[in-house]
Amino acid sequence: MKQFIVLTVVLLAIQELQGGSVVTVDDKCTCKDTLNTLTKGQLIDRLVLCNQRNDNLEKIIDGLKKENNILRKENDGLRAENCQLSEALKREKEARQKAEKALKECQKNTENLKETIEQLKKELAEAQKALEKCKKELADCKKENAKLLNKIEELNCTITQLQEKLERCRGRERDLQCQLDECKKKLNICNNELIACRKQQEELRCKIERLNTEIEKLRKQNAACEKDLNTLRCETSEFLAIATQRQSQLTSIIQRAEGESSAIKASYIGFRNSHDLTCAPCAGPA
């Protein structure tokens, strides 16, 4: 009966090693009858064999327990690592969500930048067109400036000519004064012509005074024009209107001066043609 109990324990141990499958001794099993038929020596041999197997099984069980402990420790480590990985995964998910959000914002900013770039391209094209227009206007302005400079040179030449004419008028004035002095000397002889000479002398004096007034006015306008010309070289934009106005004024003055000069010349020629200015004593016998 004891051998049967030992065998049952051994079978249970084997059952546990084989995965925990339940092994029961059936009531109809003939092992009990077989053990009863064995002799004492056979039972002892069988028991020794069972003890040896039991020792081997205990060693195997101890090894399995050690492996189980190792596996349990590894499992604990894996659990800890799993927790760490779970936390890392959670952080990665959060980082990924933040990255996706940042990516969306970046894409949105990229679209905005693209729109801004397109707008800037349009503005650049418009600026280039405006630049081309400005260049063309600058070229036209340079051409106009060159024309104005040429006009200034022409005006300077005209002013020089006018000054020369003024000098000639002064010379003529001196000649007329000399002639008037001669006429005064001839007053004693030319009593009949004295009244006419005085009238024409008075007219000539009035004309000379008007001419002097016009000359003085012309000098002032000429000085103002010179000053304006020096200023207008730096301020081209204001030059057009002022230069045109000055040109008109100068032209009118020159025309009036030329008209007055022509009138004086005609008067002088008429005076000489209508009066005999020959001095009888100076002329001598004919």
UniProtKB/Swiss-Prot annotation:
Residues 61-235 are annotated as: Helical. Residues 1-19 form the signal peptide. Keywords: Coiled coil, Glycoprotein, Signal. One of its GO terms (biological process) is double-strand break repair via homologous recombination. The keyword Coiled coil applies. Glycans are attached at N156. The keyword Signal applies. One of its GO terms (cellular component) is nucleus. PANTHER family: STRUCTURAL MAINTENANCE OF CHROMOSOMES PROTEIN 5. The DNA puff II/9 proteins have a proposed intermolecular coiled coil structure with possibly intermolecular disulfide bridges formed by numerous cysteine residues in position D of the heptad repeat. This is Puff II/9-2 protein. It comes from Bradysia coprophila (Dark-winged fungus gnat). The gene is II/9-2.
